[in-house]
Amino acid sequence: MAVQKSKVTRSRRGQRRSHDALTAAATTVDVTSGETHLRHNVTADGYYKGVKVINK
């Protein structure tokens, strides 16, 4: 069983946790359809950078 050699201070614990925060997904609005979508991804209508790339 793992046992720490000494107590981890509040400062050290906070430094370790400083990278644990969640970030919001980067979204953008398509110029053609006006639909909100994830960056660098095709919209649900099949548009990417204003160009139709997938026919439904």
Swiss-Prot record:
Origin species: Moritella marina
GO-annotated biological processes: translation
Family named by the database record: Belongs to the bacterial ribosomal protein bL32 family.
Protein name according to UniProt: Large ribosomal subunit protein bL32
Record has Endoplasmic reticulum as a keyword: no
Keyword tags: Ribonucleoprotein, Ribosomal protein
One example GO MF annotation: structural constituent of ribosome
Biased composition (Basic residues): 7-16
Gene symbol of the encoding locus: rpmF
Stretch list, region Disordered: 1-26
Cellular component, GO, one term: large ribosomal subunit
